Amino acid sequence: MDDLNLQLATSIKKQEVKYVLTVPCTILSKYYDESITQTIYLSREEEGVGLASGLTVSNQNAILMMQNSGLGNCINAFASLTIPYNIGFVVIVSMRGDELEDNPVQIPMGNATKALIKSIGCKYYEINQDNDLTATIDKAFREVHLNERPVFVLLPRKEHLQ
């Protein structure tokens, strides 16, 4: 397990996360070791918003992980369920559509991600260096408990952190 995987595993254990809900993603798979907690694979990101909401209201910590293109697909689920009903959980978002992107369909959502999160009144934190993943996820959990709404942690490709 490399350092970033270890940092994420440390945060998951420290925050007593019981479930990680995810749509398979090559960027996220480089950060996450599925053996550290119960992993639920989703076919669509919207499923994760509903499941994470249900787990949260039943006092079971969950993290939802998705690509930023998937965030675009489920923004209404956040806006119509989690925000009005004060259901907060951490959402880890892999960032596609950057200058290393080889798939042009990812670029528009790459450009829109931060503004989209802000537009629904949520906070996001960006990971900019290897050593701040644990601290950032811990800060996101504190924010979730304080404001009872989703908090997003934006993860770049590992190449941006080296």
Where in the sequence are the language-model features?
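Thiamine diphosphate
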Residues: 1-162
